């Protein structure tokens, strides 16, 4: 199938998602203050996209579920390491916002993740034969898990570093309080 036909048959929501991811990546290049829950948007998008691939392609396959979960864990670990290599965000006590340092990392990750998912789904659409389709479906599901984990691991590590820079322990309660915009009773 020619490339132009593939592009023409791509649903509009896919291009809207790509535009959104590029927009968010470009916005992340400049330092900015954002509410913690807004930082969760892109990881949530990739988790939903990855989980939908799992649901669409699993056919009850334990292999696909294992591929998704295994890749999710590997991605989360890699995302945590990646977040450790960049400057830590700072928490503004007055506003409760996160001061995110500018970086091209989000734009690059968004584009690479989109390209990998897009290419995998195009390859699936073009694959004939049940065995080849099942094998490729496992790869596409794993890619979805890998990038969902990468974004979640990076985000959670950024939250942890912001709390630590603010002199707080990064407990589950402190992370939840950060996202909803209030301090836990032990921190007040």
Identify the residue ranges that each predicted region occupies.
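C-terminal membrane-adjacent module
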Residues: 108-188
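Short juxtamembrane and helix-loop transition motifs at transmembrane-helix boundaries
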Residues: 1-6, 24-34, 71-72
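Alpha-helical transmembrane segments
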Residues: 61-77, 139-146
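A generic, lipid-embedded transmembrane alpha helix
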Residues: 40-60
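Cytoplasmic-side transmembrane-helix entry/capping segments in multi-pass membrane proteins
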Residues: 33-46, 64-71, 95-99
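Structural signature of hydrophobic alpha-helical transmembrane segments
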Residues: 4-18, 65-74
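Select subsegments of transmembrane alpha-helices in polytopic membrane proteins
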Residues: 12, 38-43, 80-83, 103-116
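C-terminal ends of transmembrane helices
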Residues: 19-34, 80-93, 154-161
